Every structure is written in structure tokens, then in C-alpha cells.
């Protein structure tokens, strides 16, 4: 995390990752995406996602959701987000949409502290993402976003880890399950 925040060219890398995400989304068929509110120097996907919403073809409604962590179940729920919507802090002091509709996104964009071969993701260790994914039917398509320096060649999944379907960095698509 400290290495990510200390990158001298972090802003330039973020711009490149915004571009990679925007281009990658062009060919996707999903109409709803669950993302995250960036904390601790994480890449901010929301500008690219909002442009994705604005670029929807006529007659197609696209939605973005942000997670709400449920302490009791250890799962995530998603609430509709749009620029300017009223926000409040969740149980972990992370902003979440206040009083907007809850829905289950068709795709999840998730931050990665690090990533390994085969779609292995290193997160903060809370398990919210993995518990949520293992319980959802149908399972949303999952794409991780990270900076290239986060590649950990020896990272292996544990029994509980849910692999990503794709992983994007500022250098492009690093992994996509076929």
C-alpha cells in the first residue's frame, strides 16, 4: 500500500488505467457495474465508469453501484451511485450512497493491493469480496484493477479466494479468463 502511494508517477498511471478501463468497457454487454469508493491510494474507477454510463446507447440504462458492508453477514450489498448523490459513512468509515436503490450488479470492478497468476487477487484481508462472490447466483463477472507494480508472481489462492475473471493495469489487460 505504501509503495503504491509513493509511486512518483501515480497520477500518470491512474490516467492510463482510466483509459484502459474505458476502452475495455466498450465491448462489454453488462448494464450494471458494482465498483468501490477508493481509499488508501486505490485507483479511482468512478470517472471511467460514469463516462461508461453517459455513453450508453439509446434505450439502454446503465447503472453503477457502490458496496455497503454488512458486519453481521460479512457480505456486500450494492446501492445505486451517481455523481452528486448523498453519501454517508458505513460501519468501516467508507462512504456509501445514502437511501438509493439496492441492486445486484452484473459485473464487479474490484481494487487489488496485488495480483498473481490466474486471476489471484490480494485484497485487505476482510474476505467481504470472496464471501459475497461465493454466495451469488448468477456470479457477476469480476475485473480487478491494479497498477503493474502490484504483480506478485508467487501469490497463490487460498481455499476461500475467488479468482478474478479479468485484471487490468495501466499497461492493459494483464489477464482474462477464456
Predicted regions, residues:
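Conserved phosphate- and dinucleotide-binding cores of soluble alpha/beta proteins
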Residues: 72-178
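N-terminal active-site beta-alpha-beta segment that forms phosphate/nucleotide-binding
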Residues: 1-104
Amino acid at each position: 500500500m505504501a509503495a503504491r502511494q509513493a509511486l512518483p508517477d501515480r497520477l500518470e498511471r491512474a490516467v492510463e488505467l482510466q483509459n484502459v478501463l474505458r476502452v475495455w468497457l466498450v465491448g462489454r454487454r453488462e448494464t450494471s457495474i458494482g465498483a468501490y469508493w477508493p481509499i488508501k491510494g486505490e485507483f479511482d474507477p468512478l470517472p471511467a465508469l460514469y463516462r461508461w454510463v453517459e455513453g450508453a446507447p439509446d434505450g439502454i440504462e446503465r447503472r453503477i453501484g457502490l458496496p455497503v458492508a454488512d458486519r453481521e453477514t460479512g457480505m456486500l450489498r450494492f446501492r445505486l451511485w451517481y455523481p452528486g448523490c448523498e453519501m454517508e459513512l458505513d460501519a468501516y468509515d467508507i462512504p456509501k450512497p445514502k437511501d438509493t436503490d439496492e441492486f445486484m450488479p452484473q459485473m464487479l470492478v474490484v481494487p487489488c493491493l496485488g495480483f498473481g497468476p490466474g486471476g489471484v487477487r490480494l485484497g485487505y484481508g476482510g474476505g467481504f469480496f470472496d464471501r459475497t462472490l461465493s454466495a451469488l447466483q448468477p456470479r457477476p463477472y469480476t475485473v480487478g484493477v491494479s497498477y503493474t507494480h502490484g504483480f506478485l508472481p508467487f501469490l497463490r489462492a487460498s481455499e476461500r479466494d475467488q479468482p478474478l475473471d479479468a485484471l487490468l493495469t495501466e499497461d492493459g489487460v494483464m489477464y482474462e479468463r477464456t
